Structure formats: structure tokens, C-alpha cells
Amino acid sequence: MRPSGRTLGQIRPVTITRQFTTHAEGSVLIEFGDTKVICTATVEVGVPRFLKGQGKGWVTAEYGMLPRSTHTRMRREAASGKQSGRTLEISRLIARALRAAVDLKALGENTISVDCDVIQADGGTRTAAITGACVALVDALNYMRAKDIIKTNPLKHMIAAVSVGIYKGEPVADLDYPEDSAADTDMNVVMTDTGKLIEVQGTAEEEPFSFEEMQAMLELAKNGINELFDLQKAALS
């Protein structure tokens, strides 16, 4: 039995609230149970120096956690003068995933910067961030089209992500903190709405996992992510 009472493949209740902030071209509050992340997408004219003159755009991302998003207060990374390896890794993961969703040529020489700020953490913050960031990205792209910054829609497909793992010997989907902290295996899966994989990050904490268990986790991830696509599309309709 899972601590939350959920079945093995059951994801937490997910809520996607668009236009959550006033200033950003795209903004979303996404809630996976008690995990809550604000995702904002900012449109900027121009691209990084390494892309200038190539006629294509860029999508980048930053991830962070508020000091009291966790059970005990964390020190702000800005106060220590550098970002942690975890923060940088997750920022790069989100950015890679979002770039896989966009035709950078169709974006023109423009940049979309997506900021994902965790305001409350209960496991699965990076997968919640990716799922919410995609909706914020869509709103930013729609803004660009409405303002004639771009002529065609650069979005190739929607993307979403979910965590899966082995908890007490069973494959489970969308781990919350009590499960994540006690799981034998933790895996994050990012997919497109065409059923293709963008990223699979899996690590055995103590007990190695089998190919059969990996297949079972991927099946749970696919089912959970398909639910998330339905929720994204409902939010955008």
C-alpha cells in the first residue's frame, strides 16, 4: 500500500492554472498534489552569441526552489554565490525537453526563457516543472504569433513528464516525498504527445532494478504522461 492510498499507476491530482502572473508572456501554476511550481515564459528578441546569424531561435530554462518550499528552510543559493549541481542539472533537463518540442528555425532569432520556481515541494518537482513549462511555452508562442513576431507556430508537439520508481518492491508512478525518500529506484521520464521519449533518467538507490522492472516503470510513465497530456490540452482549450 502506498502512503497516500493511491494505486500503483495512479498519479496525484493535477491542476494547471494559466495566466497565473501578470507580466510574463506565458505563466502557469502547476500542482501535482502538494507539489506546486510556478512556470513563467519570457519572450526576448535576439539569441545567444553562439547562434547569431544562423536564423534560428533558442529556448532556455532556469529552475529554483524557494527557501521554505521544503520541510525545513533551505538557504537561498544566491546567498552562497553559486547554484548547486542539482539546480543546474534540472535547469538543463527542462531546457533540453522544451527545445525538443520546438522548431527553432520557425522561432526566428528570438529567445524564450522559462523560469520554474518551486513554491512547495512534495516530490516530483522537476517533472511537474517540465509539464507546466510546456503550457507556459505554448502561451508564449501564441503571444509571439499574435504580435507578428513569428509567422508560423514553432510547436512540434506537447511534452510532459512524470516520475516513476520501485517502492517496497513494486513499480509506482508519480512518487511523492515519502515514497521518493524510501524508493529503491527513482526514474524521471519525459515524452512527447506522439509517444516518443525525450529523456529517461533512472537510478537505483540501493537495490539494482531489472529490465522487466524498467519496462514496467516505463509503461506506468507512459500511462501517467498520457493523462497529463489530456490535462494540458484541457487547460489550453
Swiss-Prot record:
Q: Which UniProt keywords apply?
A: Nucleotidyltransferase, RNA-binding, rRNA processing, Transferase, tRNA processing, tRNA-binding
Tell me yes or no: is RNA-binding among this UniProt entry's keywords: yes
The reaction(s) annotated as catalysed by this protein in its Swiss-Prot or TrEMBL entry are:
tRNA(n+1) + phosphate = tRNA(n) + a ribonucleoside 5'-diphosphate
User: Does the keyword field hold Nucleotidyltransferase?
Assistant: yes
Note the subunit structure. Answer: Homohexameric ring arranged as a trimer of dimers.
Q: Name one GO molecular function term.
A: tRNA nucleotidyltransferase activity
Native source organism of the sequence: Colwellia psychrerythraea (strain 34H / ATCC BAA-681) (Vibrio psychroerythus)
Name of protein: Ribonuclease PH
Looking up HAMAP family in the UniProt record yields: RNase_PH
